[in-house]
């Protein structure tokens, strides 16, 4: 009976470890897993900003572009935005550009942007905009979801869930 219990615990540990590794590895996808069409669709996206002026993501081609799908009611989004503000300030002169795509109402996004002193463009998307994030690897259509494009406009990395400062620094390091 003791051997049987030990074996059960060992198999359970192996299964949980394999599952955890699979989840962790799937969190950050590299370009090879995403079609070029996904980056083209993302760059073709044109949405209104907080002044209701339509902005196309293609205007930032040639920069390292960090596109973050978020909402004001999303707790992990609220945690990572101060990091984005800090990174935008730190790396702006090296060609880094953040763009937030809020899946929320414009008035709520505007108030949030003021309160959090967001120093990069905030565009207003809809739940239909989440289809673009799905094409860029967000299969579950959850928030936050971040797509990092290199200077050539190709998807370099994606992140499902909130980003930490060390993780973001790591992802940006080779692109800047």
Where are these regions (language model features)?
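Thiol/disulfide oxidoreductase modules built on the thioredoxin-like
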Residues: 112-118, 125-173
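Structural microenvironment flanking redox-active thiols in thiol-disulfide oxidoreductases
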Residues: 78-117, 127-134
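Short pre-active-site segment immediately N-terminal to redox-active cysteine/selenocysteine motifs
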Residues: 63-65, 69-73, 105, 142
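Conserved hydrophobic/aromatic "anchor" residues
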Residues: 45, 69-70, 112, 120
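Conserved redox-active cysteine motifs that mediate thiol-disulfide chemistry
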Residues: 61, 69-86
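A short beta-strand-turn-helix
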Residues: 44-65
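N-terminal targeting signals for export/organelle localization
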Residues: 1-44
């Amino acid at each position: 009976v003791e051997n049987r219990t030990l074996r059960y615990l060992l198999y359970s540990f192996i299964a949980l470890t394999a599952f955890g590794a699979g989840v962790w590895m799937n969190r950050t996808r590299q370009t090879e897993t995403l079609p070029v069409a996904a980056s083209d669709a993302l760059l073709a996206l044109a949405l209104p900003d907080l002044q209701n002026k339509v902005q196309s993501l293609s205007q930032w081609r040639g920069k390292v572009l960090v596109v973050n799908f978020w909402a004001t009611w999303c707790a992990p989004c609220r945690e990572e935005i101060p990091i984005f503000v800090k990174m935008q300030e730190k790396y702006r002169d090296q060609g880094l550009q953040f763009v937030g795509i809020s899946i929320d109402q414009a008035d709520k996004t505007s108030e949030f942007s003021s309160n959090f002193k967001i120093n990069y463009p905030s565009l207003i998307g809809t739940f239909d905009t989440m289809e673009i994030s799905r094409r860029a690897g967000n299969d579950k259509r959850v928030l936050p979801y971040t797509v990092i494009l290199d200077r050539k406009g190709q998807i370099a990395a994606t992140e499902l869930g909130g980003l930490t400062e060390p993780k973001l620094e790591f992802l940006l390091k080779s692109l800047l």
